[in-house]
Amino acid sequence: MDTDLNLDMQLSTIPDLALEGDTPRVFDEWQEKPQLWNLVRHEIDRRQAPGQFILTGATAPMEEQSRHSGAGRIARLRMKTFSFYESGHSNGAVSLAELVAQESPQSNGETVVDVAGIIERMAHGGWPANRNYSVEAAQENLRSYIDTVAHVDINAADGVRRDPVKVTTLIRSLARGVATEQSISSIATDIGAQRATVSEYLAALQRIFIVEEQLAWSSHLRSRASLRTAPKRHLADPALAAAAVDASPDKLLRNLAFAGQLFESQVVHDLAVLSGKRIFHARDASGLEVDAVFELAGRTVFVEIKLGQSQEIIEKAASNLQAFAERFEWEVTPVLMIVTGGNLSFRHPSGVHVVSLTHLAP
């Protein structure tokens, strides 16, 4: 839209003309012409038909009193980068929806990609435009993207000028702590900034969809657990975290602890894509935690995320899931699942589902 001079003229003279054309009519970066929102809303009321317009944008626009919420007319959808399933790195053998609805055993032993392949895919990322690039080229693109975010994008949504060096340093700090409960204070100490500055910069990065908070799960059930409330934070794609700290696949193979953090972030990302739901995490006061929690088909799903798939890892994760679930009183029993970077998907004798990320589908 920023290059469509004809649209500028239409909006300033005959705005209704801009809405004419084949449907669905797409307005990219619509937030640069915020008057489109109310124009589209009124046109939807007039046409009384679904699927008329798609408004896309790389930033969330600032709220305006004059802009109607669009309730009942405009649905909001957060776009994400490709999941493993969408990029062809999962064979789709295990349907998440079927597993939750039926709890039927779904086994698969096909090796789609091994752990080294998973790490390479995480370092490459799920951006469609980078799909045919090498890992090195994709990471170089992402580092350039981070630079653009720090110098341009973070200021575009509200016109507030921010220090690009601090923005870049903040993104690197978030990358190092991806999928963990980093406090504002610890981030401020890490990058040498005031807490207020960190909070404001984080809000700006969320507004342009670079940072996403994984909020703590809050249960309405009777429970013996006192749940913590701190969020975890993720970048838009785990590859962005890898690129921010110059973590090539070879470096990640030599630092499996950080690779495990990226894998947790990848699984949280993919669960959100495949389920269409908001993904939470949970930790109680004793330190017992579950990496991902979401609701699907009327059931609560608890997920532990493990890059490895040794018997010891599976037994410990299954025990942890059962212990956490037992702290609540359930009307409908929860689904317990371990998502791994291994090549086996099966039902554990305890009833816990073990699923490879490379087998997972919607």
Name the predicted role of every residue range.
Residues 44-51, 69-77:
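A short alpha->loop->secondary-structure connector
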Residues 92-251, 255-262, 266-269, 280:
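Interdomain hinge/linker elements that couple catalytic modules in large macromolecular machines
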Residues 26, 52-58, 78:
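Structural recognition of the conserved hydrophobic beta-strand(s) that form the central parallel beta-sheet
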Residues 4-52:
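Conserved nucleotide-sensing/catalytic segment adjacent to the nucleotide-binding pocket
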Residues 29-32, 36, 59-60, 70, ...:
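Helical "lid/switch" subdomain of P-loop NTPase nucleotide-binding domains
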Residues 61-76, 89-92:
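Short regulatory helix/loop adjacent to the ATP-binding pocket of P-loop NTPases
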Residues 1, 204, 210-362:
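A cross-kingdom feature that marks ATP-driven nucleic-acid transaction machinery
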